[in-house]
Amino acid sequence: MGLSEDIALFELNLNELIIKYEQYFLGLEKREPLKLLEEVERYVRKYHGAHISNTMLKFKFNSVVARFSSYKQYWNRITRLIE
């Protein structure tokens, strides 16, 4: 798979992860979606240090990573409040 397909899958998995966490916080899901979280983090680690020469793909990747980081901070904060 190429970089553009990986970024598209990364974004799709992130959107699914957002939905799963909202369901978890509402009580519809019994467990935190840790497996999907690991899968999304794997995309971040895979391309974190890699050189992306296409500026459009670099911008897209960085914006999805920034979105993931802000959601992850939010999820950690809410999870700590629940505990």
Region roles according to the model:
Residues 1-34, 55:
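Terminal low-complexity "docking" segments
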Residues 28-79, 83:
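Eukaryotic low-complexity, intrinsically disordered regulatory regions enriched for acidic, serine-
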